[in-house]
């Protein structure tokens, strides 16, 4: 089960990356880690740093993917984004997005 969940998550991140790049985002990092925290995708627009949390679910789930982003996850993401900005000395506004994907049964 954990392996399948990881595979679905990684596939979702690949789709999200392609989606963002097609819309003019420059992807800087995928799965950037800070301690136990992780930023799924860090991307850049000309005047904005964008931190993207990617949530991918099997279509059989009852919950919507974005419902998995609770207050604790938001706090961890903000802490990791703060570390990212400090690590790379970035002086841009930061936008936080959730990209929600539902895997179809046909692939």
Predicted segment positions?
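Conserved catalytic cores of phosphodiester-cleaving nucleases, focusing on short active-site segments
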Residues: 20, 39-60, 65, 69, ...
């Amino acid at each position: 089960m954990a392996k399948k969940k990881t595979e679905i998550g990684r596939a979702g991140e690949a789709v999200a990356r392609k989606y963002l790049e097609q819309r003019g985002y420059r992807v800087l990092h995928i799965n950037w880690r800070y301690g136990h925290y992780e930023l799924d995708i860090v991307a850049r627009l000309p005047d904005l740093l964008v931190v993207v949390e990617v949530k991918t679910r099997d279509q059989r789930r009852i919950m919507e993917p974005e419902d998995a982003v609770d207050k604790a996850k938001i706090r961890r993401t903000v802490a990791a984004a703060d570390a990212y900005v400090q690590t790379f000395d970035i002086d841009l506004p930061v936008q936080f997005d959730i990209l929600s994907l539902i895997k179809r049964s046909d692939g």
